[in-house]
């Protein structure tokens, strides 16, 4: 038969939480550092025996709250309040992923291409612009060769 352990962990957390896990005494009244400890101790007893001294507890609480408010006011410096601008969710990445998708993005890509085609200047307008540019250019400058043709004259060294 297996030997039982001396220390058990069974039911421990329930035991700890039954009375509430308490902070160390030094950290208990962090915001009430300016208040004397005797007063705080009395306040705790008044809380425990609230049937005996309900009025006392209420006065103590009021005193403690005012003392706490003063302590907090002394500790915290007022900050400038900045207006909060609501930030919307960025859907940029979702949109890009949708466009890049092989099936889903087919129509989206078609629409984008159509929009780009519509934005491009028309062929007639291009021809008019080119004729105006050629007429305005002086005759000394030779006309540009077509894209595929090579230049016949080379600079001699």
Swiss-Prot record:
The keyword Membrane does not apply. The modification N6-acetyllysine is found at residue 33. It comes from the Eukaryota. Residues 132-147 have a biased composition (Low complexity). Pfam families: Ribosomal_L29e (PF01779). The modification N6-methyllysine is found at residue 5. GO terms for biological process: cytoplasmic translation. GO terms for cellular component: cytosolic large ribosomal subunit. One of its GO terms (molecular function) is structural constituent of ribosome. It is found in: Cytoplasm. Coiled coil: none annotated. Residues 1-32, 121-157 are annotated as: Disordered. The modification Phosphoserine is found at residues 31, 140. Residues 1-26 have a biased composition (Basic residues). The keyword Repeat applies. Keywords: Acetylation, Cytoplasm, Methylation, Phosphoprotein, Repeat, Ribonucleoprotein, Ribosomal protein. Component of the large ribosomal subunit. PANTHER family: 60S RIBOSOMAL PROTEIN L29. Component of the large ribosomal subunit. The ribosome is a large ribonucleoprotein complex responsible for the synthesis of proteins in the cell. Belongs to the eukaryotic ribosomal protein eL29 family. This is Large ribosomal subunit protein eL29. It comes from Macaca fascicularis (Crab-eating macaque).
């Amino acid at each position: 038969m297996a030997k039982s352990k001396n220390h058990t962990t069974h039911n421990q957390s329930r035991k700890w939480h039954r009375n509430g896990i308490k902070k160390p005494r030094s950290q208990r009244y962090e915001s009430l550092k300016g208040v004397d400890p005797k007063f705080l101790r009395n306040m705790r007893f008044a809380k425990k025996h609230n049937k005996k001294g309900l009025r006392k507890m209420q006065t103590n609480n009021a005193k403690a709250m005012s003392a706490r408010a003063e302590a907090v006011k002394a500790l915290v410096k007022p900050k400038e309040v900045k207006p909060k601008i609501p930030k919307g969710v960025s859907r940029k990445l979702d949109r890009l992923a949708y466009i890049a998708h092989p099936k889903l993005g087919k129509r989206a890509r078609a629409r984008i291409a159509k929009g780009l085609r519509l934005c491009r200047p028309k062929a007639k307008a291009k021809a008019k612009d080119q004729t105006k540019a050629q007429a305005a250019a002086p005759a000394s400058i030779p006309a540009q060769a077509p894209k595929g043709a090579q230049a016949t004259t080379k600079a001699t060294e």
